[in-house]
Regions:
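A nucleotide- and high-energy phosphate-metabolite-utilizing enzyme signature
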Residues: 1-248
Length: 248
């Protein structure tokens, strides 16, 4: 456990160091704004993948591997959305993530559990690794609310369940996937392509309602009203009228 905590601290120190170097280089004019955004995004991907590996390592002695009925390793995908998915992170961006696995299976270690339960434990560990505040601060704040059914839904979804969900999901949920991008996980290139295909289908091959524009406009007005909290003397540059959300 002590070694695990040290690895988590090193991960955070690495993140803080590289972020400082990127910021310094941008201020000195050594890298452009666009290249800095790309660098911040790549750094986040590296940290997330390292935290995923560390989370699996920490549970390996208890659960072993997770395999399907044929004895093949179960696959997993970490999908970034928002600024992470669009490769346009800023220095204070949260990480919008969803998690997808290949389906049924069970662990091979002393403690036997199903694939769904195993992956949930892994992701709970990953979230703790990245967002819990310790003496070295925290790495990132994570937002997993864009998963199917939001906070009411399971943290990790089987691929077929994820696909079926988006056959009848809300327009804004399809919209949220426009920038979705696989950034990590475990499995073959074929597996990751399957995930990409499902996301592509959810974004570009669904049948939008006839009043799509009106519904998107209504959602934007609702967010503006509920989140911006603007007044004559106070403006919200991100969520207010004419702010960053409208620009994007």
């Amino acid at each position: 456990k002590g070694n695990e905590e040290e690895e988590i601290d090193r991960l955070r120190q690495f993140k803080h160091t590289i972020t400082f170097l990127l910021g310094s280089a941008e201020m000195e004019g050594l890298v452009s704004y666009e290249h800095a955004r790309k660098g911040i995004t790549v750094l986040a991907e590296i940290i997330v993948r390292a935290a995923f590996d560390l989370s699996q390592k920490s549970l390996a002695s208890r659960y072993g591997e997770v395999k399907d009925a044929d004895g093949e390793p179960c696959n997993f995908a970490i999908v970034g959305l928002g600024k992470l998915g669009g490769e346009e992170m800023t220095y204070h961006s949260d990480l919008d993530l969803i998690f997808i696995h290949s389906g049924e299976g069970a662990t091979t270690g002393p403690s036997v559990t199903g694939a769904q339960e195993y992956w949930i434990k892994i992701i709970q560990r990953l979230i703790s690794c990245l967002s819990t505040i310790t003496r070295t601060g925290f790495a990132y704040k994570l937002d997993t609310r864009l998963r199917p059914s939001g906070n009411a839904g399971v943290l990790v979804s089987p691929l077929d369940t994820y696909l079926n969900y988006h056959d009848s999901s809300e327009p804004w949920e399809h919209q949220a996937l426009i920038k979705a991008r696989v950034i990590g996980g475990s499995g073959s290139s074929e597996w990751f392509q399957q995930v990409k295909d499902v996301i592509h289908r959810a974004v570009y091959e669904w049948h939008p309602p006839s009043d799509l524009n009106a519904r998107i406009d209504h959602l934007r007005q609702r967010k503006e009203k509920e989140l911006s909290r603007e007044s004559k003397h106070q403006r919200n540059i991100k969520e207010g009228r004419g702010g960053l959300l409208d620009v994007e």
